[in-house]
Amino acid sequence: MMIHAYSEDYLNNAQKILGDMMDYAVNTYEFPPNQFYEMFLVSDVSMQFQTGNPTYVAGKTGCELVKEVIRKSGLLIPELEDEMYLDKSPEYWCGWALAYYQWYTGRSFMKIYHAVSIEEILNMYPVYHEMDISRFVETINEKWDQYLSLIHISEPTRLQLI
């Protein structure tokens, strides 16, 4: 049985928060998706989220996370009004699905990003957004396995170095 960083009771809210974060960052602040996500990764916001800090998975909005990531990145950008969109964008789905995958697997957001970029996840939207989330998990797990096989091939083992 997998032990998750936080209770499944928080999962739905956490998915909405990460979805709103990606949506707001891309569609209001107009960050390119990969650029903002990389800022998220190097801030401690990603660590707080993936370890299940209740402030991040239940207590803040996606808009608040975006503003915190911007602040922690050292960018001096005027704060924009909080916007939550009724129509859910591909960026929203990307964050929503990614939050589920991270929670389900326990892998860090950074490790996931090494295996699959945000652009790749966004490209999955037309086909996967209507499917059960388990199909998304299967596909990202396949990409994870491909990534692992590549790094194991490209890095010599200790025995090979002797």
Indicate residue ranges for each PLM-predicted region.
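Intrinsically disordered, low-complexity regions enriched in small/polar residues
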Residues: 58, 127-130, 149, 153
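A charged, amphipathic interaction segment
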Residues: 84-146
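Single conserved hydrophobic/aromatic residue that forms the stacking wall/gate
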Residues: 151-162
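C-terminal alpha-helical interaction appendages
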Residues: 2-103
